[in-house]
Swiss-Prot record:
Region feature (Disordered): 183-262
N-terminal signal peptide: none
Residue segments, region RNA binding: 254-260
Keyword Translocase carried by entry: no
Annotated S-S bridges: none
Gene: C
Keyword entries, A-Z: Capsid protein, Cytoplasmic inwards viral transport, DNA-binding, Host cytoplasm, Host-virus interaction, Microtubular inwards viral transport, Phosphoprotein, RNA-binding, T=4 icosahedral capsid protein, Viral penetration into host nucleus, Virion, Virus entry into host cell
Phosphoserine modification, residue list: S232, S239, S245
GO MF, one annotated term: structural molecule activity
Function: Self assembles to form an icosahedral capsid. Most capsid appear to be large particles with an icosahedral symmetry of T=4 and consist of 240 copies of capsid protein, though a fraction forms smaller T=3 particles consisting of 180 capsid proteins. Entering capsid are transported along microtubules to the nucleus. Phosphorylation of the capsid is thought to induce exposure of nuclear localization signal in the C-terminal portion of the capsid protein that allows binding to the nuclear pore complex via the importin (karyopherin-) alpha and beta.
Protein name as catalogued: Capsid protein
GO cellular component: host cell; host cell cytoplasm; T=4 icosahedral viral capsid
UniProt organism field: Duck hepatitis B virus (strain China) (DHBV)
Complexes and interactors: Homodimerizes, then multimerizes.
């Protein structure tokens, strides 16, 4: 991956959240784009990575949805006077990346106990599920951005997606009164430019550019009795003979050379 594509991929994380499709729509679109490559057993980079993220997102999404459903069902058995665990006592995504997966439950339990030692067991389970679901959602957000990048590179080409991300970020960072009303689209960027053809016929060959070299002055010539004479040369004095009469021969021309025959 060249430096421009690498920079564009990093900039994907800065795009607004509502720019990307919802998880269900994203996975469906990605599968449609990947299906021809799956049938041909392609091992292209974008195919392999996009396939990995499709599987990852589907598993994480189903698990996260299950966590939310169980957490909501526990609300009915939590004592009504129980205060929710503040956000500061819940493990965040950045912290979870530094904690081994097997120790995640222990770290979260210690934080709940530090908030309230006798916290009800049902409320503790609810707090754990909410914390893990939040971590999964942030991981899903990163994964869906990467999935969007890789399957769009298959659809439009990596260079076009790189160009599109650059233009879109420029549009987003430009004040509203100085930019166009609509954001750029990748369809418009990849559409071939059509030049309107006029009614004038053009030659198929290459046209010589004008104005680069001075024009050469054409030298007019006239034919005088079978000989070409340039008008740019110095003219001889006019002959007294009338036009069309033979030129008088010089005196030397009257002397004939001796003939080889006797």
């Amino acid at each position: 991956m060249d430096i421009n594509a690498s920079r564009a991929l990093a900039n994907v994380y800065d795009l607004p959240d509502d720019f990307f499709p919802k998880i269900d729509d994203l996975v469906r679109d990605a599968k449609d784009a990947l299906e021809p490559y799956w049938k041909s057993d392609s091992i292209k980079k974008h195919v392999l990575i996009a396939t990995h993220f499709v599987d990852l997102i589907e598993d994480f999404w189903q698990t996260t949805q299950g966590m939310h459903e169980i957490a909501e069902s526990l609300r009915a058995v939590i004592p009504p006077t129980t205060a929710p665990v503040p956000t500061g006592y819940l493990i965040q995504h950045e912290e979870a990346e530094e904690i081994p997966l097997g120790d995640l439950f222990k770290h979260q339990e210690e934080r709940i106990v530090s908030f309230q030692p006798d916290y009800p067991i049902t409320a503790r389970i609810h707090a754990h599920l909410k914390a893990y679901a939040k971590i999964n959602e942030e991981s899903l957000d990163r994964a869906r951005r990467l999935l969007w990048w890789h399957y769009n590179c298959l659809l439009w080409g990596e260079a076009n997606v790189t160009n599109y991300i650059s233009r879109l970020r420029t549009w987003l960072s430009t004040p509203e009164k100085y930019r166009g009303r609509d954001a750029p689209t990748i369809e418009a960027i990849t559409r071939p430019i059509q030049v309107a053809q006029g009614g004038r016929k053009t030659s198929s060959g290459t046209r010589k550019p004008r104005g680069l070299e001075p024009r050469r002055r054409k030298v007019k010539t006239t034919v005088v009795y079978g000989r070409r004479r340039s008008k740019s040369r110095e003219r001889r004095a006019p002959s007294p003979q009338r036009a069309g009469s033979p030129l008088p021969r010089s005196s030397s021309s009257h002397h004939r050379s001796p003939s080889p025959r006797k």
